[in-house]
Every structure is written in structure tokens, then in C-alpha cells.
């Protein structure tokens, strides 16, 4: 089972409009399904926000993908897992140290308690990140069925 199927099976997904949402609120919203599934604690998002405030928007990658996470074995990480969130509007994370604007509308929020599982998850995510048609389909997703359909239509190499 691929990472997208695992996200849907765990219920770790959400879809937002994103209008007027700050990056801090987007990070919080991206953790809500993970809280509900017992993957992270309610205040886990605060640690992610603290890391981004300290180090800048290092969690935002090409193709408007954000991968919010904290340091390994952070307090509040109850299980190793991934959450998915799609936003109809771009979420502004500000500028990086080079003055480049960082925005995201596809979020993969990470939680880690097991380094081997965590590395496997990151490896699978990197395959997803390099699959432009899949990322485009995920950005447009509005339901768990859309996530699964995108995974089926644009499979990644294992």
C-alpha cells in the first residue's frame, strides 16, 4: 500500500478553501485529522510553527508543496505518520533567505516516532513530489476518493 492510500486509510486528510488563512493556521489545520486519528497531540502544530519561525519557510518546496514537520521524536508525535491537506488558495509562508516567495497549497504533514518508517515515508513522498501530474491532481483534490483516484491514475515508482 502506498503512502497516499495509507493517508486515506488512517483518515489523515483534509481539504480547505484557504481564503485568508495564515501559514500558522494552515499548519494547525493540517494536523487536525492527525489529532483525531491519534497520530499527534493537540499541541503538536505549535512545535512545527516554532521551527518554521526559527528556521524560515524550509518546509516549502517546489510545486507549492509544504511538508510541515518538527525534529524527530518531538513531544506530541504519538505515531509515525503523514497527513495530507489540499487548499484551494495558496498559503503564503513569506520569503526565504534569498527573498524568494514561498507559497503552498498541498501539505504533507509529518510525524515521526520510528526513524525507519519515517525514512520510508520521506522516500515515498519524494517520489510523489517528482510526479507533476500527481501533484496537480492532489492540489485539485476535494475528497478522499480524489486522492485515491490520483494515486491510481498517476502511479509513482516504488
Regions found by a protein language model. Give the residues of each.
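Cytosolic covalent-transfer regions centered on His/Cys nucleophiles
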Residues: 1-158
Amino acid at each position: 500500500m502506498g503512502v497516499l492510500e495509507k493517508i486515506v486509510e488512517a483518515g489523515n486528510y483534509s481539504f480547505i478553501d484557504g481564503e485568508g488563512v495564515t501559514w500558522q493556521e494552515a499548519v494547525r489545520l493540517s494536523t487536525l485529522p492527525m489529532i483525531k486519528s491519534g497520530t499527534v497531540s493537540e499541541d503538536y502544530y505549535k512545535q512545527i510553527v516554532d521551527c518554521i519561525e526559527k528556521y524560515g519557510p524550509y518546509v516549502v518546496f517546489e510545486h507549492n508543496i509544504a511538508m510541515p514537520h518538527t525534529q524527530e521524536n518531538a513531544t506530541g508525535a504519538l505515531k509515525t505518520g503523514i497527513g495530507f491537506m489540499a487548499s484551494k488558495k495558496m498559503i503564503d509562508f513569506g520569503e526565504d533567505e534569498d527573498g524568494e516567495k514561498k507559497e503552498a497549497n498541498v501539505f504533507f504533514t509529518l510525524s515521526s516516532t520510528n526513524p525507519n518508517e519515517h525514512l520510508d515515508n520521506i522516500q515515498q513522498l519524494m517520489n510523489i513530489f517528482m510526479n507533476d501530474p500527481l501533484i496537480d491532481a492532489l492540489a485539485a483534490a476535494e475528497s478522499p476518493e480524489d486522492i485515491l483516484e490520483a494515486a491510481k491514475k498517476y502511479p509513482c515508482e516504488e
